[in-house]
């Protein structure tokens, strides 16, 4: 069973369910059981295993994953972001939820996952999420977070200088401000 405390059994169950899904078998009962396991467990690892399996068999749609982005457990919220990003292009409602989370969620893993999601957005759509992420200085000294934000907005900086300048004006992460200023100055020198 996916809910087994023994990781080997759980992994074998997930693999078998995924193989059946790939073979086109009807997994309605399995999906219901997985959903039940997800809802009833107090174990975060078990909930994640159920979530991953539901996603692998196509039973974790956008609406369900967006609901999970409100879960009290940081790892569940983080994985809901990751799985939403693994789907097709991010919808407007998913982007809005990411912006809300960027501004309000204080969990480090969630913030890192959102910063990494920047790279999956079209250039013009990156600014609202980037603004939300840099509006607080909680992770300013983190060795990874400022770089992830920068990697996400770097290609957009020269495409929209005004948005970049607005971001610099309200940015509370010195390293991101420095990178943007350096990039804009470098581009200005080429003109």
Where are these regions (language model features)?
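Long, ordered, helix-rich scaffold segments
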Residues: 1-191
């Amino acid at each position: 069973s996916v809910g087994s405390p023994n990781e080997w059994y759980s992994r074998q169950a997930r693999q078998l369910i995924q193989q059946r899904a790939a073979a086109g078998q009807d997994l309605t009962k399995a999906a219901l059981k997985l959903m039940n396991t997800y809802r009833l467990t107090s174990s975060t690892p078990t909930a994640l295993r159920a979530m991953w399996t539901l996603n692998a068999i196509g039973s974790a749609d956008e609406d369900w994953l967006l609901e999970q982005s409100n879960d009290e457990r940081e790892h569940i919220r983080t994985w809901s972001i990751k799985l939403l990003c693994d789907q097709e292009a991010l919808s407007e409602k998913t982007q809005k939820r990411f912006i809300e989370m960027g501004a309000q969620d204080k969990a480090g893993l969630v913030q890192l996952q959102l910063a990494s999601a920047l790279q999956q957005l079209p250039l013009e759509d990156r600014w609202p999420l980037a603004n939300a992420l840099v509006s607080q200085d909680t992770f300013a000294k983190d060795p990874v977070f400022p770089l992830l934000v920068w990697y996400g907005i770097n290609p957009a900086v020269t495409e929209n200088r005004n948005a970049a300048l607005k971001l610099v004006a309200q940015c509370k992460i010195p390293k991101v401000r420095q990178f943007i200023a350096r990039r804009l100055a470098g581009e200005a020198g080429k003109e």
